Amino acid sequence: MSDVHYKKHRVFRETEDVIFYDISVEESNASDLVVHTGPATSPPDDSVGAKQFYIHSFQDDYNRVVSGERIFELVNYSWKYPYHIVHLNVHNGTLFIPRGTFHRSQSGKDGSIVINQAKRYEGFNPDAEFYPVSCATNMELYNVFVK
């Protein structure tokens, strides 16, 4: 079984040319709208060109693409295979990224819009949760890519 998990949406109503989706995430206590206006990478590479990642200690992410597409790179040392590349579009469902997982995303050429129906834990501080970690300075993270 894969360590990468999705929460699927549920269609609860359809009319001519209209589909209503229930995209609820029961665990969620926060919602963020993340807009890439072009082919952005978040977080961007550092000043020497090394990949950077976010890692949350007090937040789980539940990312759903609502427009465009994103490629997520995930690194979690506790997984059987620590490194995953996930292609996410409007049909995949919600990608669950547990706290303690290094992650970054890249949009397609036209950008993308993601809703993150996050679960934030006591102690959450956006200044601490969104600090990029570089492969150039974190040897354990670097070693995931050179093996």
How would you name each of these model-derived features?
Residues 1-90, 110-147:
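Active-site region of the double-stranded beta-helix
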Residues 92-105, 122-123:
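Histidine-centered metal-chelating micro-motifs
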